[in-house]
């Protein structure tokens, strides 16, 4: 498939057909490989299809499997529909005014759009390995065009991070291929490069599946590099947002975190108080402090 052919969906149904109780809007072929209805249980090739579907007013992105990568509410395109994307915003409890956010993995652009809308003084750079995913995100998920605040770049996330030391104060990593986390962005070398890519007060935020047999290994790799690590379980079981701090946040008092959570909830509408309570269940703590 040529680059120009990837710019738009190669398969479109003006009269959508039902597939797994969803309406299929379009399927985009990446790398010349199109998977069928996810049959046979075979592990998909790295480059596969991008499917856009709709159900009950929610549009979703799939990468060659039934797993939902991104979702957008048509009535509110900037809302963070999936609970793991909301959990990844828990970093605001510690870094409420990010200056430059770098994201590895665009998907449907949920986090990119949220930062763009609610943080007008923040610069956002999003790295996506597939040009076709970028095209779909902009055509079907209302990801804005690049401007002085937003840049969406085509490239491999691990290589980009390695080439940009001390470039950002927040680095968000959500790179899955529909089956598992992309290996280039969960290695010990990647986490070391992520540490180097952050400013001194920076924080790495990684979306991990707690059902992944390698979850503990990934977490250990992060802990080996960063000064402090805090896990935030998503409201829907299965995902954990791992926040890793280049410089330790100390031992924040629970009362202070709850106060910050209430203020952030009022501003952004996310369940920050639940994030705080999730931290209590997942991390070293005392009755009065986190990481104590």
Report the location of each language-model feature.
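Alpha-helical subdomain
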Residues: 181, 208-212, 284-291
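A short, flexible beta-alpha/helix-coil linker loop
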Residues: 66-70, 176-179, 204
């Amino acid at each position: 498939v040529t680059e120009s052919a990837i710019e738009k969906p190669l398969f479109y149904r003006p009269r959508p057909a039902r597939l797994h109780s969803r309406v299929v809007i379009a399927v985009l072929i990446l790398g010349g490989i199109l998977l069928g209805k996810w049959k046979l249980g075979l592990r998909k090739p790295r480059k596969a299809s991008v499917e856009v579907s709709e159900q009950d007013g929610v549009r979703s992105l799939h990468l060659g499997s039934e797993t939902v990568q991104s979702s957008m509410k048509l009535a509110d395109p900037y809302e963070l529909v999936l609970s793991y994307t909301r959990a990844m915003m828990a970093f605001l409890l510690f870094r409420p005014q990010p200056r430059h956010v770098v994201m590895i993995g665009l998907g449907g652009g949920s986090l990119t759009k949220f930062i763009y809308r609610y943080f007008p003084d923040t610069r956002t750079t999003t790295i996506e390995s597939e040009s076709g995913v970028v095209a779909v995100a902009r055509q079907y998920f209302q990801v804005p065009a690049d401007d002085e605040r937003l840049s969406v770049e085509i490239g491999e996330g691990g290589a980009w991070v390695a080439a940009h030391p001390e470039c950002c104060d927040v680095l968000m990593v959500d790179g899955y291929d529909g089956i598992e986390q992309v290996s280039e962005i969960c290695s010990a070398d990647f986490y070391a490069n992520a540490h180097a890519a952050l400013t001194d007060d920076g924080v790495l935020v990684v979306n991990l599946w707690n059902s992944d047999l390698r979850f503990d290994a990934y977490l250990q790799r992060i802990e080996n590099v960063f000064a402090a690590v805090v896990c935030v379980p998503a409201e829907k079981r299965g995902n954990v947002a791992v926040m890793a701090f280049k410089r330790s946040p100390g031992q924040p008092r629970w009362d202070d975190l709850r106060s910050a959570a209430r203020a952030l909830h009022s501003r952004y509408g996310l369940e920050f108080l639940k994030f705080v309570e999730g931290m209590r269940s997942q991390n070293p703590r005392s009755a009065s402090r986190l990481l104590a």
